[in-house]
Amino acid sequence: MPTINQLVRKGRKSRTSKSDAPALNFGYNSMKKKATDNPAPQKRGVATRVGTMTPKKPNSALRKYARVRLSNLIEVTAYIPGIGHNLQEHSVVLIRGGRVKDLPGVRYHVIRGALDTAGVDGRMQSRSKYGTKRPKK
């Protein structure tokens, strides 16, 4: 525990909070080949690998994921939500932050219905989250 004198001299340091989606905090200047400070809510990227992985201990499934090289040249793993998808290698996708609790290392979500990613077919509820258009009457 610090003395009063130490607190007067140094003071308390406030904790710096870490970002949940660090890859969205950088841009890239291709002329200077340098990362720039350009935070964004979403980023575009190209899928370099699409596959399935198994979740952590109490759960059992084959969760779909895509390895994505973003426009700022950072490569991340993103979860593909919903039933069925049309992604393959070299598909252009839009990602947002948001981790998947039972998949280690997956801190991003692919946005359905944007760029090359199709919305979920036959989805009636929560359509906006899965990029599905309103069904015709």
UniProtKB/Swiss-Prot annotation:
3-methylthioaspartic acid found at: D102
Cytoplasm as UniProt keyword: no
CC annotations in GO: small ribosomal subunit
Region (Disordered): 1-44
PROSITE patterns: RIBOSOMAL_S12
CDD domains: Ribosomal_S12
Keyword terms, alphabetized: Methylation, Ribonucleoprotein, Ribosomal protein, RNA-binding, rRNA-binding, tRNA-binding
Acetylation as UniProt keyword: no
Single GO BP term: translation
Gene Ontology molecular function: rRNA binding; structural constituent of ribosome; tRNA binding
Role: With S4 and S5 plays an important role in translational accuracy.
Subunit relationships: Part of the 30S ribosomal subunit. Contacts proteins S8 and S17. May interact with IF1 in the 30S initiation complex.
Family: Belongs to the universal ribosomal protein uS12 family.
The protein, known as: Small ribosomal subunit protein uS12
Gene source species: Latilactobacillus sakei subsp. sakei (strain 23K)
Gene: rpsL
